[in-house]
Amino acid sequence: MSKTYHFIGIKGSGMSALALMLYQMGHKVQGSDVEKYYFTQRGLEQAGITILPFDEKNLDGDMEIIAGNAFRPDNNVEIVYADQNGISYKRYHEFLGSFMRDFVSMGVAGAHGKTSTTGMLSHVLSHITDTSFLIGDGTGRGSANAKYFVFESDEYERHFMPYHPEYSIITNIDFDHPDYFTSLEDVFNAFNDYAKQITKGLFVYGEDAELRKITSDAPIYYYGFEAEGNDFVASDLLRSTTGSTFTVHFRGQNLGQFHIPTFGRHNIMNATAVIGLLYTAGFDLNLVREHLKTFSGVKRRFTEKIVNDTVIIDDFAHHPTEIIATLDAARQKYPSKEIVAVFQPHTFTRTIALLDDFAHALNQADAVYLAQIYGSAREVDHGDVKVEDLANKINKKHQVITVENVSPLLDHDNAVYVFMGAGDIQTYEYSFERLLSNLTSNVQ
C-alpha cells in the first residue's frame, strides 16, 4: 500500500538515498532542508521530489515522518512542532532497522570504504537480481519486488545498532569521530556489538588487528592479501592505468581472475569482500566477475573530470587513512604526473586528534594546498587548532589558500589535482575550474 513520507533533512546523504528508494517503490515522498545547494539534491530534483524549506506547516499527522539524526528540538522547527503536538517520527536509522526486516539484507560497515564497497556490492547484485539499495553518496534504488536489500551501515553515534542484517562486510576499524567516540576501544566495542547482530555471514578484513578480535554468532570470513589466516585471498595483482586485475582464492580453491576499472589497493580489498559475500550467499561467480568489470565508482569517491586539459579528482577523503588510499589510487592511474593534494580538514575535533596523521598522509603527495578547517554544525571553534598548525607539519611544498584566490595551484605542470574533504572543498574546486576556463578564454 502506498504511503506518504516526509523527510526532515532530505538532503543528507543517507536521507536522500532513502527518499529516492521509497519513491521508486511507489510511495509519495517529500522533504525539507536548508536552501544551500548540496550534491545529493540533483537526484531528488530529477525524480520530481519536492524539497521545501523547514516549516511546521510541512507536517501532517497522516504522514510517516523520518528525521535526520542531526536535527533536534534545539535546531529545527519541525522537530519542535512534532514534539509539541504529539506527531510521531522515526530517526533514519530506526526506520531502516525495521524496513530491512522484509528483505535478505546485506550491510557494509567500517571506518573507511563503506560507500565505495556498498556501491560496488549494489552494482553487482542489482545486475544479477532485483535489488533495492542505499548508498552513502545519496544514491538509492527501490523495487517493490526486490528480495535483496544492500545498505551502508554507519557507526557514528552507534546508529547501526537497530540493524540485524543476514550478511555484512566490515572493511576496517579506525579511530574517527572523536566528537563522539572516546578511544579506539570505544570504536571497537561499537563494531563488536554490531557484529553480534549479523545472522548468516560476517566478512572482515583479516589484516586489521582490531577486526581480528571481533566476535559474532554468525560465521566469520576473513579476506585480505596474505594467504595465511585469511579465507578469501587476493593475489597476482596487476595494477595499471586502466584498473586492477587480481586472482581470488577461497581456502585454497581458485575462484578465478577478476578485474575492476577502479584504482588503489583498497578497492581490490573492497572487491574481494564483495566476491566473498556473494560467493558465500550462493551467487554465480561468472556473473559477479562480469559485472565487477563495469563498476565505475560512486559519487565523490575519486570522481574525475578534465578542464582545459587538466585532470581534477574530487574525493570525500577526510581521514588520514582515506587520504593515503586516494593518493595511492591517483599514482596508480597517473604514474607520470605530479600529484597535487588540495585538502580541507573537516571538524576541529578530528583535526586536533589526528593532526600528525594528517601531515603524514598528505606528505604522500608531491605538493599540498590547504583550505580553512570546515567546522561541523555539531561543534564550536574554540580556537584550539588552525589550519596553519597542520601546514607547519607538512614537509612537502605547501601553502594555505582561500576560495577567492586559488591561483597558486597554477604553479604546476603535468599535474593531477586531488581535491579532498567532507566540507565545502568543492567550492575551491569550482573556483579552480573557473580559473582554468578563464585562462582558455583569454588565450582565445
From Swiss-Prot:
Its main location: cytoplasm. InterPro entries: Mur-like_cat_sf (IPR036565), Mur_ligase_C (IPR004101), Mur_ligase_C_dom_sf (IPR036615), Mur_ligase_cen (IPR013221), Mur_ligase_N (IPR000713), MurCDEF_pg_biosynth (IPR050061), UDP-N-AcMur_Ala_ligase_MurC (IPR005758). It holds the Pfam family Mur_ligase. GO terms for biological process: cell division; cell wall organization; peptidoglycan biosynthetic process; regulation of cell shape. It catalyses: UDP-N-acetyl-alpha-D-muramate + L-alanine + ATP = UDP-N-acetyl-alpha-D-muramoyl-L-alanine + ADP + phosphate + H(+). One of its GO terms (cellular component) is cytoplasm. GO terms for molecular function: ATP binding; UDP-N-acetylmuramate-L-alanine ligase activity. It is found in: Cytoplasm. Pathway: Cell wall biogenesis; peptidoglycan biosynthesis. Its EC number is 6.3.2.8. It comes from the Bacteria. SUPFAM superfamilies: MurCD N-terminal domain, MurD-like peptide ligases, catalytic domain, MurD-like peptide ligases, peptide-binding domain. Gene3D superfamilies: Mur ligase, C-terminal domain, Mur-like, catalytic domain, NAD(P)-binding Rossmann-like Domain. ATP binds at G110, A111, H112, G113, K114, T115, S116. Keywords: ATP-binding, Cell cycle, Cell division, Cell shape, Cell wall biogenesis/degradation, Cytoplasm, Ligase, Nucleotide-binding, Peptidoglycan synthesis. It is an enzyme of class 6 (ligase). Cell wall formation. Belongs to the MurCDEF family. This is UDP-N-acetylmuramate--L-alanine ligase. It comes from Streptococcus pneumoniae (strain ATCC 700669 / Spain 23F-1). The lineage of its organism: Bacteria, Bacillati, Bacillota, Bacilli, Lactobacillales. The gene is murC.
